[in-house]
Amino acid sequence: RAAASIRAFFAYETAAGHLEASPAEGLRRPRQERRDPYILEEEEIRSFLRETEGSSAKQLRDRAMLGLLCATGLRVSELIALKTEDVDVQIGYVRQQARGQERVVSFDEELRLALCLYLESGRPLLLKEADEEHLFFNLSGGALSRQGVWKMIRAYGQKAGIAGEVTPQSLKNSYAVHRLLRESRAVKQRAVRQRSGGR
């Protein structure tokens, strides 16, 4: 914006005859260095989620929401669009639609219990309309916004004392990285067992 303002000022001065040529000619907006999203270590993810622990309706909601983001790699837009029918807390999976395709992602016992607690003790206290189908909503019973969830993530990241900036994209990338690492370890372990069994 500063560069554009400078160019506009000198263009006006040139047009008014105060200058023969604009000294800002050729001035371009400086390129901003693009930073890759921060990848959280597994201990940082645990610290991040610990900040949501508590028994209030808001804490139960936040633990379930952020736990889902960390454990499934969902986008925020996908998270806030979830309906209660999309989550099976008995088996432990979430079903979501992405680009016309259905994706089913399983989650662990810890998150299953967090979701059960939210559905039993948190969601009923936040619910304003009996026929509300969405899984999560704001404290007024209305729809969650992407910006609201983004602010929540950043606030919990700061409370946890995480050095890097915690954003929805960093949580999604962290999920992908740690999933690949787990799969790589599993492949190596299978290879070791196969070699051991062949001796």
How would you describe each model-predicted region?
Residues 1-199:
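Conserved catalytic core of the tyrosine transesterase superfamily
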